[in-house]
């Protein structure tokens, strides 16, 4: 009987603790401004303009439910700006759920932003796996396009760059991956660029509402957190071909006067080194696009894989080799390493002076692409 009483007391205490914990968590969330995306721009006087997309449960005179809004403050440092967000909203600004860091053009093209990257990397509350991206224009303007997009800007960008990019031939970097690229060996790396593109308004109920979409087809190159250049479509395609985890590369070939679209379904990339020669070997498995928008009147839908002549895959091979060669030429011209060659040499030779600091013009390249049906 005594043991039953003791068990009963333990259960009562456990229940009370759970209730108190739930109450605390509820109040804790209610009193916080949960930041899901941060945008950083540079003001004319070199102060930071920080825009936060905030999710906060409504209380008091605010609307009922959870909603997002943006708030912009100006400060001398990121830490000061976050403190100002707390003051303005009357709620503690929380970075624990923030998964997007967006750099505005006024910032990343003009200054060395190493201190900003270090601040977030060494923050206990900020996720190292967060998405980092650059804005075409000001980050503040992009983060305020929620109404035009009819959704949270931060969540839309995070979804594309974290989940969908690997299937649409778009190389990406997390905050940690980018930060490491700027600290180690060649000190070069890239960040995805996001641009808002206006489109025609198709909503008769709100004829004056701005509508549009985000374009992701550019990468910005940095060396030790200083702006170098923006990669165009062909250079992005070349980098995608040399990125193992990325598929969805698109090729358009011609047969019988028609244009036919192929998509990469599987890929194997091998980067070998012999002396100072880099051997780039890419194996692609490509399939026909399920639909084609190039005026073939649906003729592809009746074509089976067995009907495809090898000449089509030879065209893909030539296109892929040309794209990779353009990326190689670009890296040598600008002396940037976007495919981790310095790390390859370090793995082979150890931390030698050559492996740590060779110029891209000091090595030669051979390129081989093989294409098969998927």
Which residues does each PLM region occupy?
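Membrane-proximal alpha-helical signals and transmembrane carboxylates
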Residues: 2-374
